[in-house]
Amino acid sequence: MEGMARDFIGYGGNPPKVEWPGGARIALNLVINYEEGSELGAVEGDPQREMTAEWVYPAKPTERDLANESMYEYGSRVGVWRIMRILNKYDAPCTVFACGLALERNRAVAQAFVKHGYDMVGHGYRWISHYGMNEEQEREQVRMCRESIERITGQRIIGWFTRPLKTQATRRILAEEGFLYDSDCFNDDLPHFEKINGKQFLVVPYSLEQNDIRYWKNQMFTANDFFEYVRDAFDTLYEEGATSPRMMSVGLHCRVIGRPGRAQGLDRFLSHVRKFSGVWITHRNDIARFWLERYG
């Protein structure tokens, strides 16, 4: 299927000599995944409960998991505000992978995102996988998300990240709906193009390993676990950026790194980053627009 052929080569040993604004070695994009209130659950009438959790307790799929519901609520009640305070401390721009229903249920958070100048990327109306959807269902999910976010924030949505798994039709649907890019892959340290309907479509890769969700995968425990991993990734990319500038994404979840014992990992990372010159901390939409203007 066009646009879904696997590419094992990419830029290979000759990545493009990217000229980020200001001659930066690295473009750093911090991403808040704002999903709380849009996840699966019996309270929403879903046939299954949300299984992405810090602890999974025995319960029937159609019964409410009140413990997990409260963990998600922590993210929207407390965690998101803590993350924003840390970002403000370091004057760090941020992108929000936003679920429409989540923003609808917490307008104060949506207003704060707008106030701080964060850019919005579509992440579904509900925080649900597209796997198993037909094209009509998937297109409806995309349109509902876009309409909701644009109505609440006033921002035109040009980018998208699907809760895995996407389908073979996802990227084509996004292109047909007028999106400029998606972040539905993890295969490079730089943006690249895929051909959809005979035209170039931009992909701005994301990261699931420079990502706090690893706490919920039992791969991290302390704040230093997060700090040391993302610091080492940054240091590697910054060093490589002396001759071949790179891009780095860091994924944040309000219910995860918004916890007090973990938030220090984000604080330490930003403190580390601010010691370096030649770092473009920016919005995802700005990276996409730059790439389209310069290399499209």
Predicted regions and their residues:
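Catalytic alpha-helical scaffold of carbohydrate-active enzymes acting on polysaccharides/glycoconjugates
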Residues: 2-159, 163-202, 227-250, 256-296
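Binuclear metal-dependent hydrolase catalytic cores centered on His/Asp/Glu-rich metal-binding motifs
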Residues: 208-229
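A structural motif
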Residues: 196-214
